[in-house]
């Protein structure tokens, strides 16, 4: 397998990181072609102090952002730190297992590809929300993009080089998916179990109102992305 980099953005996820980081260290020991970057995206729970304990681990990086740069901004900052041929991102909240990345067959892939999990085990309301967004994107872009925010996501470096001013919010996943479709990339999907949070709480999903706000932001961004693709 070619070299793989994993970006894990976090915002006030210290308790989850206490579980996740030792697992990351073990993965690095077992996989010499692996690099991991954890992005502390403006946390105020002591995440930076915890990550500093691992400053001497080879191929393990941490990036401290003093102010929160948004979901997409944190991921992009981490991706720019990677030196690997394949790049990926997943969340620090433990709702998916970092080992899920290795469920994808990353051998003999073309220059342009996107691999992404399809979340299973979610609530009915979340499934309805995802279906609605999938249907809207299909109508808007004439491209089928199911479960846009599924985890994890893995892309080729050549696809990443096509990213031009991606959004800094939760539209980042939509942008990556649409760019992959635009470049006629191979799309690989795999069902991934999605668990409840062990610690903390979602930083955006507080119920119906937060979903409506996310929909509005996504609709606005999709309009600007549509104009960009038509230029």
Please give the residue ranges for each predicted region.
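Hydrophobic helical membrane-anchoring modules
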Residues: 1, 15, 165-231
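Acceptor/aglycone-binding surface of glycosyltransferases and processive sugar-polymer synthases
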Residues: 67-69, 73-81, 86, 98-170, ...
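Donor nucleotide-sugar binding loop of glycosyltransferases
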Residues: 13-17, 43, 71, 97
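Cell-envelope/extracellular polymer assembly enzymes that use nucleotide-activated donors
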Residues: 3-5, 35, 175
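A conserved acidic beta->alpha catalytic loop
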Residues: 40-49, 94
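Conserved donor nucleotide-binding strand/loop of the catalytic core
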Residues: 34, 48-81
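Short, well-formed alpha-helical segments that are part of the catalytic scaffolds
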Residues: 13-27
């Amino acid at each position: 397998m070619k070299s793989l980099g994993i970006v894990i953005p976090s915002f006030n996820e210290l308790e989850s990181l206490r579980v996740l980081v030792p697992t990351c260290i073990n993965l690095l020991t077992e996989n010499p072609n692996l690099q991991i970057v954890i992005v502390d995206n403006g946390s105020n729970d002591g995440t930076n102090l915890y990550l500093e304990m691992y400053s001497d681990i080879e191929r393990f990086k941490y990036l401290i952002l003093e102010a929160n740069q948004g979901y997409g901004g944190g991921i992009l900052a981490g991706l720019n730190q990677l030196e690997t041929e394949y790049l990926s991102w997943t969340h620090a909240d433990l709702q998916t297992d970092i080992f899920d990345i290795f469920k994808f067959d990353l051998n003999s892939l073309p220059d342009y590809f996107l691999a992404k999990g399809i979340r299973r085990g979610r609530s009915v309301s979340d499934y309805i929300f995802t279906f609605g967004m999938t249907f809207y994107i299909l109508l808007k872009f004439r491209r089928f993009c199911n479960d846009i925010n599924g985890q994890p996501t893995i892309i080729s470096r050549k696809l990443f080089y096509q990213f031009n001013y991606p959004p800094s919010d939760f539209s980042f996943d939509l942008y990556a998916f649409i760019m992959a479709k635009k470049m006629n990339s191979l799309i690989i999907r795999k069902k991934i179990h999605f668990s409840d949070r062990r610690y903390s709480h979602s930083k955006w999903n507080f119920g119906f109102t937060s979903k409506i706000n996310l929909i509005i932001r996504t609709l606005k961004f999709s309009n600007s992305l549509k104009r960009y693709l038509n230029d």
